[in-house]
C-alpha cells in the first residue's frame, strides 16, 4: 500500500540523476582548503533535517540504502525497525524532506515488517517502476512495484549464502550492499560479512538477467563491514566500508574498486586458500570520512570526528564543473537516541582505470660488448644463469630519460643500469654505462643502439677506484652504485648514487666533470668512502639516491632518499632534497614524502608539470608476493606543516587493464598477464612521463636473481607504457 499517488513514486524513480542538495555548507575554504577530505574528495555539506522526524505516522529512521531517482529525489529503504512496516521513503534531497512512502508487501498483499524483512540494499530498475530490495534476514533480493509496493518476484540466492544453519552466512551479515550498472545489465550483491570458512574475506555476487553468474573475493579493512556498493560500469565500483568501536565511534571509508580481470571464486570453498593477490578485487581509498572537516556537526556519542555516524547508504549524483561527481551518503540511526539520520554531500573525482598501451622486453641475457663479468659472484646457477658472463649484462634499468632533451615519445631513450650485481665486493668487473635504446612496442622488442661509458680520465673522483691506473679510468660497480639520472639545462648528466650517497656530474659523453657532491647534512652510508673510522652511518646501505627528478628547465634537481635515515624517528619519511644546478650546491630546502609503511621504498621520481612530481612507491617482493607497486603524485608547492607532501595514488601497477591484449599471448607459466596486467617485478625503478597522460615504467631485474614474471627464469627488463587518465 502506498500513501502517495502511483504517479508520484514511479515518476520519482523514472531516471537516476540527482540534482544539487541544499544542505548545511561546509566551512568556507581558506588556505589549505579545509573542505578537503583528501586529494580526490571534498565535503560540500551535510544535513540532519531528517533526524527523528515522522511522516504520515511512521518514524523516519533506519535508512540503510539510498537509490537515486529523478531530479533531486532519491528512494531510501528502511531496515528492521521493530515491528514497523517495511517501507521505502521518497526523499527530496533539495528540500531535505520526505515526500512519500511506499509500504512493501508480499504478492498476496500481506505486509512485510521489521520482524521478517531487514531492508539493506536498494536499486531502481530500468523502467523506473520497479525496484530491487535486499533483505539481510534470509538473505533475499526481491522485486517490488513502486506504485503499490507489492512483491513481483525474487532472485535466486546460492544456498551457501543463506543464514546459518541453512547456509554459511552469519546473522545480520549478508546482503547489505546492492548496486546495478548504469545500463542496468549487471547487479552486484555484496556480503557485509564473510561466510563461515572464508576467514576475513567477503563475497560479492554478480547477477545478469536475474541469475547469479559469478562471485568475486573482496577484502575489507580489519574490523570493517561491506555496507554499500555503487556500480560505475566497466567492472568498476565504489565500496562503502563501515565499522564501529564502542567508546571510540565509527569508521567510514569509501574505496574505488576494480573487478577488471578478477576470477570467479564460486568454486572456491574457502577464500583463505587464495594466495594470489590478483584473485581479490583491487581497491584504492577514495575518501576516509574522518578526514573531512567537522563543519559544525555534532555527535550524540563519542566519535573521532563529530561528522561521523553509522553511514550505510551511498548514491552517485550529478557531474560538477571540473569533472567531479556528487556523492550522497546517508546514515542509519537504528532508531536510537544516540545516533543520527544524516545526509552528506561530497564532491569526488573518479578517474577511469589505467590501461596498458605498450610493452617491450629486453632479454635478461642480452650481453653487451665488454670484458667478462660476474667473476666475483658465486658460480652457482641462479634462475638458469651461471656466472661468469660472456660480456656485460644489462641488469635492468634504474633510470630512464629521453635520449634527446624534450622528447616525450618514449621511443628513443637513454637507460641506465645500476652498479651491476648489488655490492661493492662483487661488481668490480661491471662497467657503469647508460645505453641508447629504442623500444618497439609493436614487436615488443628493444633495440640496443649503443652506450656511453661513465669514466674519470681527469681524476675528479678523490678516492681510489678500480681502474685508477688506466687511461680512461672507466668506472665500475665497485666505485659507485648509480641509481638515478637527470639531464640539466647544459646537457650535462647528473647521477644519483647510493654508496655516498653522492651526486655525480658528467658531460653528455659520460666523463666526470667534478668531484662527487655529498649530502649537505653529513649523511653517509656504510659504503661511503668518506665514512671516518668509528663514525656511524646514518643512511642505510642501498637507501641513497634511488630517485631524482629534474625541473623542466633543467636548473633544479630533486634527489630523494630511497629509505629512511637510521637516526630519523619517523621511519616512513623519505627526504626530498633541492639542488641548484647553476649554483652547484644544495639549497638547504627539503621536503618529506611519507610512504604508506616503513618497509616501502621510493623507486624513482620525475617532474610532471611545474613542481608536481610522480614517484614510484614499492615493496621489495616479486611475483604473487608483490603487494605494493604504485605511482604516486605529489606537489612540492602544496606541502603542509613541516614540509610534509600530499600524495595521491595515480595507478596501481599490479592492476592495469589490458583490454587490447598487449601483454598476450602469455609465455609458459608467465605471471601477471592478460585482461588484468600486473608489473610484479621486484625492483620497479624507472618512471618517465610521456606525452598526455601516458607514463613509461621499467624495472631493474637484479640479474640474475629475480624471477617474478616466470618462476625459475631470470627476469627480463620490461618497459611498459601506461595510459593514466587524470594523471596531471
Task: Give short role names for the model-derived ranges.
Residues 32-728:
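Sequence/structural signature of beta-propeller domains
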Residues 1-31:
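Secretory targeting and sorting signals
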Amino acid at each position: 500500500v502506498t500513501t502517495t499517488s502511483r504517479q508520484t513514486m514511479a515518476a520519482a524513480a523514472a531516471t537516476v540523476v540527482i540534482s544539487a542538495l541544499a544542505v548545511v555548507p561546509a566551512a568556507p575554504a581558506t588556505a589549505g582548503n579545509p573542505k578537503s577530505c583528501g586529494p580526490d574528495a571534498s565535503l560540500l555539506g551535510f544535513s540532519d533535517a531528517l533526524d527523528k522526524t515522522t511522516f504520515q505516522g511512521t518514524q523516519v529512521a533506519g535508512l540503510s540504502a539510498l537509490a537515486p531517482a529523478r531530479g533531486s529525489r532519491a528512494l531510501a529503504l528502511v531496515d528492521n525497525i521493530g515491528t514497523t512496516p517495511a517501507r521505502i521513503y521518497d526523499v527530496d534531497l533539495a528540500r531535505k524532506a520526505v515526500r512519500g512512502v511506499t509500504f512493501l508487501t508480499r504478492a498476496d498483499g500481506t505486509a512485510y515488517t521489521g520482524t521478517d524483512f531487514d531492508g539493506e540494499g536498494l536499486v531502481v530498475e530500468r523502467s523506473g517502476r520497479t525496484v530491487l530490495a535486499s533483505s539481510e534476514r534470509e538473505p533475499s533480493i526481491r522485486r517490488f512495484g513502486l506504485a503499490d509496493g507489492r512483491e513481483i518476484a525474487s532472485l535466486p540466492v546460492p544456498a551457501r549464502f543463506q543464514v546459518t544453519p541453512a547456509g554459511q552466512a552469519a546473522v545480520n551479515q549478508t546482503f547489505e550492499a546492492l548496486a546495478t550498472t548504469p545500463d542496468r545489465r549487471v547487479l552486484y550483491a555484496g556480503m557485509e560479512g564473510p561466510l563461515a570458512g572464508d576467514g576475513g574475506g567477503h563475497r560479492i555476487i554478480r547477477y545478469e538477467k536475474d541469475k547469479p553468474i559469478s562471485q568475486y573475493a573482496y577484502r575489507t579493512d580489519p574490523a570493517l563491514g561491506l555496507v554499500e556498493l555503487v556500480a560505475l560500469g566497466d567492472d568498476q565500483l565504489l565500496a562503502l566500508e563501515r565499522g564501529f568501536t564502542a567508546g571510540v565511534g565509527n569508521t567510514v571509508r569509501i574505496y574505488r574498486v576494480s573487478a577488471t580481470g578478477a576470477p570467479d571464486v564460486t568454486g572456491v570453498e574457502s577464500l583463505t586458500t587464495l594466495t594470489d593477490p590478483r584473485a581479490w578485487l583491487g581497491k584504492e581509498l577514495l575518501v576516509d570520512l574522518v578526514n573531512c572537516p567537522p563543519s559544525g556537526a555534532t555527535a550524540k556519542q563519542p566519535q573521532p570526528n563529530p561528522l561521523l555516524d553509522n553511514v550505510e547508504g551511498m548514491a552517485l549524483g550529478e557531474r560538477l564543473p571540473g569533472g567531479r561527481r556528487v556523492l550522497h551518503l546517508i546514515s542509519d540511526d537504528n532508531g536510537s537516541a544516540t545516533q543520527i539520520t544524516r545526509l552528506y554531500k561530497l564532491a569526488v573525482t573518479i578517474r577511469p582505470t589505467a590501461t596498458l598501451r605498450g610493452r617491450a622486453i629486453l632479454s635478461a641475457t642480452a650481453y653487451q660488448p665488454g670484458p667478462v663479468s660476474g667473476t666475483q659472484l658465486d658460480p652457482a646457477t641462479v634462475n638458469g644463469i651461471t656466472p661468469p658472463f660472456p660480456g656485460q649484462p644489462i641488469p635492468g634499468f634504474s633510470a630512464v630519460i629521453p635520449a634527446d632533451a624534450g622528447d616525450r615519445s618514449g621511443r628513443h631513450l637513454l637507460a641506465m643500469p645500476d652498479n651491476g650485481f648489488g655490492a661493492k665486493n662483487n661488481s668490480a668487473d661491471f662497467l657503469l654505462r647508460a645505453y641508447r635504446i629504442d623500444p618497439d612496442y609493436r614487436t615488443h622488442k628493444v633495440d640496443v643502439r649503443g652506450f656511453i661509458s661513465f669514466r674519470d680520465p681527469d681524476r675528479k673522483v678523490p678516492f681510489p677506484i678500480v681502474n685508477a691506473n688506466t687511461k680512461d679510468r672507466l668506472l665500475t660497480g665497485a666505485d659507485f652504485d648509480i641509481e638515478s639520472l637527470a639531464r640539466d639545462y647544459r646537457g650535462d648528466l647528473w647521477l644519483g648514487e647510493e654508496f655516498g650517497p653522492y651526486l655525480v656530474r658528467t658531460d653528455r659523453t659520460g666523463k666526470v666533470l667534478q668531484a662527487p657532491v655529498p649530502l649537505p647534512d653529513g649523511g653517509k652510508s656504510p659504503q661511503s668512502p668518506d665514512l671516518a673510522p668509528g663514525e656511524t652511518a646514518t643512511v642505510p646501505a642501498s637507501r641513497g639516491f634511488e630517485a631524482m627528478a629534474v625541473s623542466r628547465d633543467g636548473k633544479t634537481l630533486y634527489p630523494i632518499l630511497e629509505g629512511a635515515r637510521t637516526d630519523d624517528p619517523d621511519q616512513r619519511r623519505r627526504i626530498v632534497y633541492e639542488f641548484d644546478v647553476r649554483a652547484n650546491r644544495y639549497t638547504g630546502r627539503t621536503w618529506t614524502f611519507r610512504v604508506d609503511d616503513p618497509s616501502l621504498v621510493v623507486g624513482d621520481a620525475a617532474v610532471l608539470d611545474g613542481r608536481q612530481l610522480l614517484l614510484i612507491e614499492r615493496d621489495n617482493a616479486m611475483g604473487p608476493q608483490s603487494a605494493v607497486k604504485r605511482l604516486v603524485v605529489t606537489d612540492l608547492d602544496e606541502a603542509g606543516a613541516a614540509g610534509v607532501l600530499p600524495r595521491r595514488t595515480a595507478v596501481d601497477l599490479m592492476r592495469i587493464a589490458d583490454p587490447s591484449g598487449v601483454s598476450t599471448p602469455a609465455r609458459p607459466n608467465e605471471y601477471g598477464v592478460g585482461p588484468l596486467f600486473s608489473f610484479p617485478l621486484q625492483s620497479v625503478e624507472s618512471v618517465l612521463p610521456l606525452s598526455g597522460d601516458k607514463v613509461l615504467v621499467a624495472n631493474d631485474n637484479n640479474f640474475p636473481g629475480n624471477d617474478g614474471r616466470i618462476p625459475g627464469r631470470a627476469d627480463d627488463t620490461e618497459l611498459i607504457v601506461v595510459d593514466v587518465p587524470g594523471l596531471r
